[in-house]
Amino acid sequence: MKFAYSLLLPLAGVSASVINYKRDGDSKAITNTTFSLNRPSVHFTPSHGWMNDPNGLWYDAKEEDWHLYYQYNPAATIWGTPLYWGHAVSKDLTSWTDYGASLGPGSDDAGAFSGSMVIDYNNTSGFFNSSVDPRQRAVAVWTLSKGPSQAQHISYSLDGGYTFEHYTDNAVLDINSSNFRDPKVFWHEGENGEDGRWIMAVAESQVFSVLFYSSPNLKNWTLESNFTHHGWTGTQYECPGLVKVPYDSVVDSSNSSDSKPDSAWVLFVSINPGGPLGGSVTQYFVGDFNGTHFTPIDGQTRFLDMGKDYYALQTFFNTPNEKDVYGIAWASNWQYAQQAPTDPWRSSMSLVRQFTLKDFSTNPNSADVVLNSQPVLNYDALRKNGTTYSITNYTVTSENGKKIKLDNPSGSLEFHLEYVFNGSPDIKSNVFADLSLYFKGNNDDNEYLRLGYETNGGAFFLDRGHTKIPFVKENLFFTHQLAVTNPVSNYTTNVFDVYGVIDKNIIELYFDNGNVVSTNTFFFSTNNVIGEIDIKSPYDKAYTINSFNVTQFNV
């Protein structure tokens, strides 16, 4: 949420050919081509105004709807008060209907800052009667920021999350702090005969602490513990979240041969400013939660996404399969978010991702536990009638590359690349021994994304600086060239693997089947979208492409 200083999973559903925006009570659908500068098609954007953190994510089991709320200033394309929760709904986590402002702060000089949504099935709060289906008893837990105070408030909905009533005895949690925000609440079942209760993770931001509270009714909260000065601190903690995540196999710190449980707890903490790439970043800790205290399995700092534009991750409450963990993040960075060259909206969300814990071989001699990410999209609809292009078993030469020309480019596509480095004794003498893919604009090929792998550096790179948009040249925080470790997917065959989604002005890269991820925005001129892909290397026969498949999305 806005900082304040006191100083690949296919889902059945509707076609994603139109993002249906509804705002200010107007039910007229607005297509993604109505707006300027290449609005994304499969990443949610507000119809107009400013957006940042995702809030209040939940699944309505009665209507089979996914609900997304978000930090929203409808009056401008920069952050400002009054700040609301915007609201969008989807059947398939791909095509969204935007309902505009849903929950507000109550005064023009205040903000309804970030928070979460729970379903109060058993009416522990006393807000509901039998007229409200238990599956739709939505309660928002959020931060009211007004003047020097930040405190936790609750509001409830009697119509399935479209409108809200504020609790008359707010605030429910106030510690007399100006930096106390972003509550994430979940239900924790009791153990050993104890009753279940609500658990809140909330940031006391500028003392670098996540506080854990418990409550029987969402109104009265008791401090249980804190998680303080862990990981990468930056300038402050924000947007904490605690969730139990399933895994295939996890390396535990005891090296015990005993059988392991089928899940572990993951604590998310976002920091801004002060991320290792500059500005915003989200980290996570793997561990155990006993109902009062979170204990990490080790002292590592793990980052959820290695790109520049992935912040304030929040997970959904009440997924259809309770073991599944889905989440979404804000796809921007506070270093330049308010200057990004889009209009009449500013900012997009990431794709929804499904998270699991997996063993990950960072080198041939060791393995570690990481949070694996898989994009969640309605692939059946997106790939229907979409055009696919393929290259197989191609050894790249320095004289002749490969070129793919996209028919009727939409700007939204997926690609999957598997390649090997063939090796050479004198390759270290080459200044930059790269395999490069140039994703070029269809109307002006002087605007392009360049991405690929360089063997001497042992990393994948992205260059997003080749554009005529002044913002990209003038804002020095909009880092042009970025690198991320691209792990070998198979140390025996030396195969590298990367899956990518490009959507108008955002690219998400999933390395080693999602064990490493990088999300970054980029900006081309209006109506100049990816229309051609060139594959090149300056070093003869250093790389072989086992397969490269590109599919344009049906949007």
Swiss-Prot record:
Keyword list (alphabetical) reads: Cleavage on pair of basic residues, Glycoprotein, Glycosidase, Hydrolase, Secreted, Signal
Q: What is the effect of changing F3L?
A: In strain: CBS 6556
Q: What is the effect of changing G299D?
A: In strain: CBS 6556
Q: What residues bear carbohydrate chains?
A: N32, N122, N123, N129, N176, N220, N226, N255, N290, N385, N393, N490, N549
Q: Which InterPro entries match?
A: ConA-like_dom_sf, Glyco_hydro_32, Glyco_hydro_32_AS, Glyco_hydro_32_C, Glyco_hydro_32_N, Glyco_hydro_beta-prop_sf
Q: For binding substrate, which residues are annotated in this chain's numbering?
A: W50, M51, N52, D53, Q71, F113, S114, R181, D182, E238, W334
User: Which cysteines link up through disulfide bonds?
Assistant: none
Q: Which GO terms are recorded in the biological process aspect for this UniProt protein?
A: sucrose catabolic process
Active site per the UniProt annotation: D53
**Which interval of the chain is the signal sequence?**
1-16
Which chemical reaction does it catalyze?
Answer: Endohydrolysis of (2->1)-beta-D-fructosidic linkages in inulin
User: Could you name the Gene Ontology cellular component terms for this entry?
Assistant: extracellular region; fungal-type vacuole
Removed propeptide positions: 17-23
Q: Name one GO molecular function term.
A: inulinase activity
Localization terms from the record: Secreted
Q: Which family does it belong to?
A: Belongs to the glycosyl hydrolase 32 family.
Its protein name is: Inulinase
- Source organism: Kluyveromyces marxianus
